[in-house]
C-alpha cells in the first residue's frame, strides 16, 4: 500500500460515500479507537505498570476480574461518556447499563463492549483484545432502558475489535466489508493495512477447546472426529487444531488465513445456551465474519437473527469459513 491511509481518513471517506455512515457514528468510532490505544498502552506496560493479577472482585457472570479488566472498562467509559455521541453503554463487566450522565450531551447510539477478551492470557503475555458493537437507540420513547439494547445482531451499525499482540490491530466493519488497521506507535494513529478482508470458504484448521470434548453434543463430536481422522477419514484431508483461549486472537487468525472457531453448548451447564455472550462477543464477531464472507451460527440458526432476551445472554458459537460452518450446522439439523 503506497499511500498510508489513517483510520480517520478511512471513516471520512465512508461518510462521504452517499452518507454511508453518519458523522456522529464516525466520531464515535474514532473515540472508541482512541480508547483502544489507551488500553494498549496499559497492556504493554504489564508488570511495570502494576496492572497484572486479579482485582479481588467478580463480574456479573461470577468470573474473577483481572486488574486490566477493570482498567479497560473504565478507559472505555471515560473516553465515550462525554462526546455527545452516545445515550448509554453496556459492558460485560457491569451488571446493568451505564447511562450517559446528564451533565453531558446525549447522542443517538448505544455502545456495547467486552473491554478485555481473553483475560486468562493477561499474566502470561498472550494476545488479548477489546470487542465492541454499536446499535441505534430506538426513537419511539425518551430516555434509555435495558430493553433498548435487546436488538438482534442484524441491527448493528458498526462492530469491531482491537487485538493487543505483537502489533495492536483494529478490525472494523460498518456494513461495507471489513478493514484492518495497525497502530503506528510513533505517529500514534491507526493506519489501514487491508481492505475487503475475505475468509476462505474452505479450511484445514479448527479452533476448539479439546479438553471439553466429553461434554459436547453429538454433532460437534462428529465434526471434530471427522477432522481428526485426516486423509483416511470422510474429509479426505488433514486438519490442524489451534486454540488461544482468546476469542479475539482466534477470530483474528481466521480472518487472516481461514478456519473455524467453535465454543459449543456442553453438558456441564445444560440450562445455558452456551458460554460466550451474545451481545458483547457473538454479535459483533458474527457480523465481522459475515462481512468477510464467512458464516456464524449457534448450530441451529444465524447468530445475527437471534432475538436477545436479556443483556448478558449466552450463546453457542460456530463461526468462520463458510463451508465448514454450514457443515457443522447441518450436522445439528440432521442433514
Curated annotation (Swiss-Prot):
Pathway: Carbohydrate biosynthesis; gluconeogenesis. Gene3D superfamilies: 3.40.190.80, Fructose-1,6-Bisphosphatase, subunit A, domain 1. GO terms for cellular component: cytosol. Its main location: cytoplasm. It is found in: Cytoplasm. Mg(2+) 2 binds at residues 114, 117, 281. Keywords: Carbohydrate metabolism, Cytoplasm, Hydrolase, Magnesium, Metal-binding. It catalyses: beta-D-fructose 1,6-bisphosphate + H2O = beta-D-fructose 6-phosphate + phosphate. InterPro entries: FBPase_C_dom, FBPase_class-1, FBPase_N, FBPtase. Binds 2 magnesium ions per subunit. Pfam families: FBPase, FBPase_C. Homotetramer. Belongs to the FBPase class 1 family. NCBIfam families: PRK09293.1-1, PRK09293.1-3, PRK09293.1-4. This is Fructose-1,6-bisphosphatase class 1.
Amino acid at each position: 500500500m503506497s499511500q498510508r491511509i489513517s483510520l480517520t481518513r478511512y471513516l471520512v471517506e465512508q461518510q462521504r460515500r452517499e452518507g454511508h455512515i453518519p458523522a456522529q457514528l464516525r466520531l464515535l468510532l474514532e473515540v472508541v479507537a482512541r480508547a483502544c490505544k489507551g488500553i494498549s498502552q496499559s497492556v504493554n506496560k504489564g508488570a511495570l505498570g502494576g496492572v497484572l493479577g486479579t482485582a479481588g472482585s467478580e463480574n456479573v457472570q461470577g468470573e474473577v476480574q483481572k486488574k486490566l479488566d477493570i482498567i479497560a472498562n473504565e478507559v472505555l467509559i471515560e473516553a465515550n461518556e462525554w462526546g455527545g455521541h452516545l445515550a448509554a453503554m453496556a459492558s460485560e463487566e457491569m451488571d446493568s447499563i451505564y447511562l450517559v450522565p446528564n451533565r453531558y450531551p446525549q447522542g443517538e447510539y448505544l455502545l456495547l463492549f467486552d473491554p478485555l477478551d481473553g483475560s486468562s492470557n493477561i499474566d502470561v503475555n498472550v494476545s488479548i483484545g477489546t470487542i465492541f458493537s454499536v446499535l441505534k437507540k430506538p426513537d419511539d420513547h425518551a430516555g434509555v432502558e435495558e430493553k433498548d439494547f435487546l436488538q438482534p445482531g442484524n441491527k448493528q451499525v458498526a462492530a469491531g475489535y482491537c487485538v493487543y499482540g505483537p502489533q495492536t490491530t483494529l478490525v472494523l466493519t460498518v456494513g461495507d466489508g471489513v478493514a484492518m488497521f495497525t497502530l503506528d506507535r510513533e505517529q500514534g494513529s491507526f493506519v489501514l493495512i487491508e481492505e475487503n478482508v475475505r475468509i476462505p470458504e474452505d479450511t484445514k484448521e479448527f479452533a476448539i477447546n479439546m479438553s471439553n470434548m466429553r461434554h459436547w453434543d453429538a454433532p460437534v463430536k462428529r465434526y471434530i472426529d471427522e477432522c481428526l481422522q485426516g486423509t483416511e477419514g470422510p474429509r479426505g484431508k488433514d486438519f490442524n487444531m489451534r486454540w488461544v483461549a482468546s476469542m479475539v486472537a482466534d477470530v483474528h487468525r481466521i480472518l487472516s488465513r481461514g478456519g473455524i472457531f467453535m465454543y459449543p453448548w456442553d453438558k456441564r451447564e445444560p440450562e445455558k445456551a452456551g458460554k460466550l455472550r451474545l451481545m458483547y462477543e457473538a454479535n459483533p464477531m458474527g457480523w465481522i465474519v459475515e462481512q468477510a464472507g464467512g458464516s456464524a451460527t449457534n448450530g441451529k440458526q444465524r447468530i445475527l437473527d437471534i432475538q436477545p432476551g436479556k443483556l448478558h445472554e449466552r450463546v453457542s458459537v460456530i463461526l468462520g469459513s463458510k463451508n465448514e460452518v454450514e457443515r457443522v450446522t447441518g450436522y445439528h439439523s440432521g442433514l
